[in-house]
Amino acid sequence: MNLSSLKPVKGSTKTCKRVGRGQGSGCGGTSTRGHKGQKSRSGYSKKIGFEGGQMPIQRRLPKFGFKSINRVEYKAVNLSVIQSLIDTRCLAKIGIDDLVDAGIVSANRLVKILAGGIITSVVEVTAHAFSEKAEKAILKVGGTVIRTLKQ
């Protein structure tokens, strides 16, 4: 066997449809485009969103809202996640580095601690932001809350 004798497996290739090569081929004459009209001509391409002259949906519906350029996006971390980290790693202080090491957040994200779940251990938590309920829950069990500066 050599490279010059290799052929594709039978049935794996398909011959392309040759249009406009006589009536006997089944694709002659109009070349599968039907008779006359804009869509039968060469170079035809319909404008995106064109609905045949009807007012298109993007013009019928009103404009609304906007994206704030000053939006600060946080990665939410619940207290239940903090508690599971304390249980598995026996930590007294939990910072952003610990969350990154555990694979919970990526290094370049801002972190906000939310009050989902319960926390039972005394712990010092460092993050960029805290919800009011999360902060109260951490302080209630005797822990401390440290806010770091936003990067």
UniProtKB/Swiss-Prot annotation:
Annotated spans, Disordered: 1-45
Coiled-coil positions: none
Keyword rRNA-binding on entry: yes
UniProt keyword annotations, A-Z: Ribonucleoprotein, Ribosomal protein, RNA-binding, rRNA-binding
GO CC terms, sorted: cytosolic large ribosomal subunit
Source superkingdom: Bacteria
NCBIfam families per record: rplO_bact
UniProt-recorded name of the protein: Large ribosomal subunit protein uL15
Organism: Azobacteroides pseudotrichonymphae genomovar. CFP2
Organism lineage: Bacteria, Pseudomonadati, Bacteroidota, Bacteroidia, Bacteroidales
Gene expressing this chain: rplO
